Each structure stands twice: as C-alpha cells, then as structure tokens.
C-alpha cells in the first residue's frame, strides 16, 4: 500500500508541475537599491527581455557565426539501412528419437564418428526400452489387482509402525523431562545439604574454640 501511494503521489506531483508550470513571457531587471513594486509599476526602459526557449544551443568561438546545419547524427541514423532478420519457424512437435536433448548444451563438442555411433546405439536402446515398457504394461495390468491388496497391507503396517514410533518418541521425551527434573531436585538438595554441613561445622569449631579459651583462662 505504501508503494502504491508513493507512486500515485509522484504521478500527481509530476502532473501538477506539467499543468501549472509556465515559462514567463518577459523578465524585468530592476536597478540596484530600487523599490521592486515601484519599478514594476513605472517600468524601466530597455530593462525587459522577451523570454523565448531556443530550439537548440550552438557553441561558437571568437564571435563567429555558425550556420545551423543539420546534425550529423540524424543523417547517420537515417542513412544506415536496417537489416532484416530471417527467423526459422520452429517445428510443432519435437520427438526425442528425431531430436535428442544434446542441442540444449551451450558448448556442443565437435561431431565425430564415435559420437555418432554412440548416439545411434543410444537411440536403438531407447526404442527397445519403449517397446519393452509397452509389453510390461500389458502384463502389469493383470498383476495390479493382486498387488493392490498387498500394498494396502504394507501401508497399514507402515502406518501402525509410524504411529508406534511417534508414541515411543513422545514417551521417551516425557521420561527425559522427568529425569531432568529429578536431577535438578537432587542438585538443589545437595547444595542445601552442603550449606547445612558448612554451618554445623562452623558452629562446632566455634564451640571448641570457646571451650579451649575458657579452659586456658582457668
């Protein structure tokens, strides 16, 4: 939406400029230190210039007049004949036996007798395989009915095995989460036990130090 609104704004902006912008007919030059409104009202002699847009701009040196000749580029463009390109109509049907896919290669190697023999052998193999496939398709139509029931059994067994694997993965994930929670609880209990042992150890040491100090004072 932002892109569409920006494009619409640009189109409206350019259209407004092209409609409202006009080239002035005259440019009036006011003398220095003069009031502009008074100058425009009274008019300054020989201070107005008629504004005209030139068709072309020609640069000439040493105050020499240059005849406005025809541009050489335009003559060159009109003199050069346009060459017509002959395009060959493509065939309606493309077959692999008549046209192999080797023409798609950008850099085609030079044709040699060995390459021609290899292509001929490949073409014969393709035709033979196509005929064998046609024969096999007729035989497979009879077997499809018997194989359909077996395939259904296989799909059901595969579906049940997939469901079992999903259930096993979910149960394993739950067990791993429970084990992680138990490990966290054990670590917290060990930390609290270490703190309690440190407090008890410090209390016992302070008690023995106090008793020894009292005994030495006696």
Curated annotation (Swiss-Prot):
InterPro entries: Mff-like_dom (IPR039433), Mff/Tango-11 (IPR008518). The modification Phosphoserine is found at residues 129, 131, 146, 171. The chain crosses the membrane at residues 199-216. It is a single-pass type IV membrane protein. Residues 167-198 form a coiled coil. The modification Phosphothreonine is found at residue 89. One of its GO terms (cellular component) is mitochondrial outer membrane. The keyword Cytoplasm does not apply. Residues 1-198 are cytoplasmic. It comes from the Eukaryota. It is found in: Mitochondrion outer membrane; Peroxisome; Cytoplasmic vesicle, Secretory vesicle, Synaptic vesicle. It holds the Pfam family Miff. GO terms for biological process: mitochondrial fission; positive regulation of mitochondrial fission; protein targeting to mitochondrion. GO terms for molecular function: protein homodimerization activity. Keywords: Coiled coil, Cytoplasmic vesicle, Membrane, Mitochondrion, Mitochondrion outer membrane, Peroxisome, Phosphoprotein, Synapse, Transmembrane, Transmembrane helix. The keyword Transmembrane helix applies. Residues 217-218 are mitochondrial intermembrane. PANTHER family: MITOCHONDRIAL FISSION FACTOR, TRANSPORT AND GOLGI ORGANIZATION PROTEIN 11. Plays a role in mitochondrial and peroxisomal fission. Promotes the recruitment and association of the fission mediator dynamin-related protein 1 (DNM1L) to the mitochondrial surface. May be involved in regulation of synaptic vesicle membrane dynamics by recruitment of DNM1L to clathrin-containing vesicles. Belongs to the Tango11 family. Homodimer. Interacts with DNM1L. Interacts with C11orf65/MFI; the interaction inhibits MFF interaction with DNM1L. This is Mitochondrial fission factor. It comes from Pongo abelii (Sumatran orangutan). The lineage of its organism: Eukaryota, Metazoa, Chordata, Craniata, Vertebrata.
